[in-house]
């Protein structure tokens, strides 16, 4: 194990210092997989690899790498965003505080594909870091992506919206749900596929959230779907009716 650690670190140092930017980038593309190699290692992940992932010098006493410059390179930023869940999973939720600021900076990255990658894995991050950290750090990200300037980012997050909400405490999930009807009628009024992404989750959310939905948001969303000008959404609204009655009857 120690030999493997040393060899990997030597290789990554050499590749990071290569004269070719393409070689450096190709090496960095492997960073998530290399870090994951240590998920069962009793000594944990070498700190040098974590620092490399964060855009810092591999040795703590070195100075040089500018994290701001590192993140402005969209290729590197996208690699970090894509590998974030795997790296946090390997390091464990107790190390989230170390990576949190880097994650937050990526959520406001200028390049849409970087934010889109984070939106795609938001529900996975919630499962990894747990409800408390999710409420503190990921709900603000979710709120931001609900209104992202890029429709694709919002659409990507909405694909797994139900999984994200079911990771939250009941009250936090209710607060998230409370925002959605207004978004349907304003931000998403001219984006039918965003409305469809929301509507698609309603049948699955009704059995788990309806009885705690004191504000009636799920009923409101069902009615909005039933009255939507898009036929596919009206069909989803129709599906919601028997599920709603069944849920009330069973409880």
Report residues per predicted region.
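Extended, low-complexity, acidic/polar intrinsically disordered regions
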Residues: 1-251
